[in-house]
Amino acid sequence: MENLEQKLAGDGRYVLEVRDDKMIDANIWDGNFVVADANKAAKSGDIVIALINNDEAVLRRFYKLDDRRVLLMCENKFFKPDIFSQNDIAIQGVVVGVFSYPK
C-alpha cells in the first residue's frame, strides 16, 4: 500500500481545508480538503489557490484574459466573477485533488 501522506503532500503539494461554498458547482464543498501543487503552472480553466493583494487566499477557477488581466471565477451561480490585474494576484498552487472525511 502506498503512503497516503507522501502522495498528498510533499514535492510542492499541500492540503487546505475549504471554508466556503463558492465552488459547489465544481463539487468542492465547505469542509472538503483540496490538494494543491505549487510547482504546477496554472492554465486557463484550472482551479487554483490565488493570493489576492498579498492578503486573502481564495479557491477559484482561473482564466487568463490577456497579458495584464485574469478572471477568478467562483463555481456557484450566486457569486460573480472578479477581474484582477496580474500584479494583484499570485497563484499559490493548482488544485490536483479533492477529498473529504466522513463526519
Each model region followed by its residue ranges:
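A short, contiguous structural element within a folded domain that forms the immediate neighborhood
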Residues: M1-L51
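Residues located in well-ordered beta-strands
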Residues: E17, V58-R61, V94
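Well-ordered beta-strand positions in beta-sheet-rich domains
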Residues: F33, L59-R61, D82-I83
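Glycine- and charge-enriched low-complexity intrinsically disordered segments
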Residues: K64-K103
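Short acidic/polar capping segments at secondary-structure boundaries
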Residues: K40-A41, D55, K77-F78
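Exposed loop/turn and edge beta-strand positions of beta-sandwich/beta-sheet ligand-binding modules
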Residues: G12, E56, I89
